[in-house]
């Protein structure tokens, strides 16, 4: 069991690093990593040695190359730049903004995006792992399966979409995770997610203080936890949305400085709407050269719905948490998830201490004659 969840435990070690880097708490970050590494040495020297190496690499990357981010380097590439030029040539105004938001993750000067931030549902209106997982799942299920044509086509489409969205971290997570799953089919999902995160961090340490990166991985941990319990589908959807919003609420509060009290309701309401417009926006592309901005009416429900949600919701104005709260909050969640995961994958673990404990021989009862 010690090595079964190796990458998962390694990822949990670095989760709080996001908050320390965000607030430039370098001394605290270094102290935290030293303490964790010393504890890991008591588990196994190889495990501790690798964690120490990862810690040193993390600090060196963040200090020497703070501006190195994969997403920034890939914003202008052979596919994304011509596509943006084509959209700018045939569309303009609000229609242009909606297409860029739903198709290529472009969020600048977009009122719908700003409304989604205030409603704490911004993850639904940008290209995320949710959308790409849906795309890959459709191809894997419905395309021709012989000679792995469905999987090869799915990976090609994911790679093209990565270039199109500028290698957004949430999209990169899906590509790396799916690739690792094909290479190591017996790997535990927690290990797959942990290794995916560590590989992305090595490619771009700036991911540690990127909202999309942290939201994507924290949401996946919640999904893994909920999927281990058999529940009624509607109840599972509500519970999943609730837990995700609870787990990511400190990050949302850090970004927005207020929380939407009706986040769960809005999340359930806008999820099918966002998925519909994600698919429909691609279907509109062939019509754009002939119809142009006249297609903007297709999106008219979105500003109306977002404005209605803003007018009817209740916002909780809370103070911005400090690093102590982040450490305690995510430390407790990490501990709870770790204990639950170990128990789920190795239920006999808790019994071993009882089995290996010193045997107590029952005292002979005096015979009664």
From Swiss-Prot:
InterPro entries: ComEC_N, Competence_DNA_uptake. GO terms for cellular component: plasma membrane. Its main location: membrane. It is found in: Cell membrane. It comes from the Bacteria. The chain crosses the membrane at residues 25-45, 47-67, 119-139, 152-172, 206-226, 235-255, 268-288, 295-315, 323-343. It holds the Pfam family Competence. It is a multi-pass membrane protein. Keywords: Cell membrane, Membrane, Transmembrane, Transmembrane helix. To B.subtilis ComEC. This is Uncharacterized protein MG316 homolog.
